[in-house]
Design a protein with these regions (language model features):
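Short acidic low-complexity segments
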Residues: 26-35
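Glycine-rich adenosine-cofactor-binding loop
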Residues: 6-22, 116-127
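Short aromatic/hydrophobic-glycine micro-motifs
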Residues: 24-27, 82
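Glycine/serine-rich phosphate-binding loop and adjoining beta1-alpha1 elements at the start
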Residues: 39-118
Length: 127
């Protein structure tokens, strides 16, 4: 079996050591030892599948029983009885995420518009 590949952001000795260690293991051994399953935020599309793909029941079966499931909008029947942390129920997370979304929307508008935003009526709304 091929070794897993990891993409990381940031640089630190700890991160380098962790990536080296993880690259030497199989996915099964990493998954069976994991304390946390981090899902996308929001975690599921309208059909109930994990956004971005993946087989949730198989992933859950391979995890330790007491592993945390972390993501957003985690009201999914497969997660019943699991320890979950739903970022989208945290008002601080939601506010910070809205701030970042608004910042990016304004930046994109500034790049695409043929004029400045100064004096223009502008409303930034989220999801």
């Amino acid at each position: 079996m091929a070794h897993p590949k990891f993409i990381t952001c940031g640089q630190s000795d700890e991160l380098s050591r962790a990536v080296t260690q993880l690259q030497q293991l199989s996915w099964q051994s990493v998954q069976s030892q994991a304390d946390i399953l981090l899902l996308p935020v929001p975690s599921f599309n309208d059909s109930g599948s994990v956004k971005g793909g993946g087989d949730l029941p198989s992933a859950l079966n391979a995890l330790k029983e007491d592993a945390w499931i972390v993501g957003g909008n985690l009201q999914h029947p497969t997660l019943a009885g699991r320890k979950i942390l739903d970022f989208l129920k945290d008002p601080v997370y939601v506010a910070k995420n809205a701030q970042i979304t608004a910042h990016c929307a304004i930046r994109l508008a500034m790049e695409k518009l043929p004029c400045t935003l100064s004096g223009l009526p502008c409303l930034v709304i989220g999801w």
